[in-house]
């Protein structure tokens, strides 16, 4: 790897996951479209996707799709159901079901230099577990170092700030 040594000081490297280390946008859009139709009878628009879905915790997205009418129990149900559909779509998409080129080599480099790194993602825990198992991410990052949507974060920015 041709990585130039640097004198930049930092505490940790934080990676986003979906759409950065793993190109899965089409699977998310397909799953959210399916649930938008189920919840409100219509699919999602590109504007809704950009403003209310991408990078937003599931609870907020489902609250948006339901017009704020769902109970916490309904929100949790649809969140789990949507993500199960998403995981199925990922496994069916065998051509794209892998980390981006160079990710594993870069993780190896960071680990060899003892540079701490982690992943912060708006994904829920079952998806994080799915990614860890599917891509063997625990070769580089301990399971308890992943930051994910556990219902306590307002947005992805808060997750990134908490990551290191």
Name the predicted role of every residue range:
Residues 39, 64-68, 104, 108-118, ...:
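Substrate-recognition/cap helix-loop segment adjacent to the acidic, metal-dependent catalytic center
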Residues 26-30, 130, 158:
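Generic recognition of short, well-ordered alpha-helical segments
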Residues 102-106, 159-162:
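Well-ordered alpha-helical segments embedded in enzymatic catalytic cores
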Residues 12, 154-164:
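Conserved Lys-Pro-Asp/Glu-containing loop-to-beta segment of HAD-superfamily phosphomonoesterases
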Residues 27, 57, 105, 126-127, ...:
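Short alpha-helical
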Residues 1-4:
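A short, compositionally biased domain-edge/stem linker segment
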Residues 6-101, 109, 113:
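N-terminal helical cap/lid subdomain that shapes the substrate entry/recognition surface
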